[in-house]
Amino acid sequence: MSPPVPERLSVVDEIKQTKPFPTKSAEAYVGLLRTADESKRHLGDLLEPAGVTLQQYNVLRILRGAGEDGLPTLTVAERMIERTPGVTRLIDRMETKGWVERRRCTEDRRRVWCKITKKGLDLLEGLDRPIEAVDAVFDAALEPDELERLIEYLDRVRAEMRASQTVAGGW
């Protein structure tokens, strides 16, 4: 027997919108923001027992993917999902916990390289299985071809937002 299908609410019903959105774009944007918030809360709930924040998890994943050499701090900041001006302080806290280590670049003393430690790798390994539950949500909600289209649509929206910022000099 298949598990029950969760009740699907439109964003209009979910936020108890009493007036129609002025445009479909506005409705889609609110839906995207609500989905992003729900996703962040879901992931945060999975990470909380391990004492890891979303941003810390993101840094650990970036550094694990970088391999043994690690990455410059600024590169880590550029690759983060949720960009933060406080990446140095974030990495300070992670270094205190023993999850990452830093070293100055010998060629350019202004550059600082970050590398994930064994403790950080072990932490991530313990989180890999629970995080698969996040993927399972997408797999349950969408067919593979729908996921491909969603990825394409999101890429297009982000590209348009970047182009709009460039043309308008920011929002």
Which residues does each PLM region occupy?
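C-terminal regulatory/oligomerization modules of transcriptional regulators
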Residues: 1-21, 145-171
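Alpha-helical hairpin
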Residues: 21, 52-54, 116, 142
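N-terminal helix-turn-helix DNA-binding core of bacterial DNA-binding proteins
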Residues: 33, 37, 41-83, 166-171
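Alpha-helical linker/hinge and terminal dimerization helices associated
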Residues: 39, 80, 123-139, 157-168
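Charged, amphipathic alpha-helical coiled-coil/dimerization segments
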Residues: 92-152
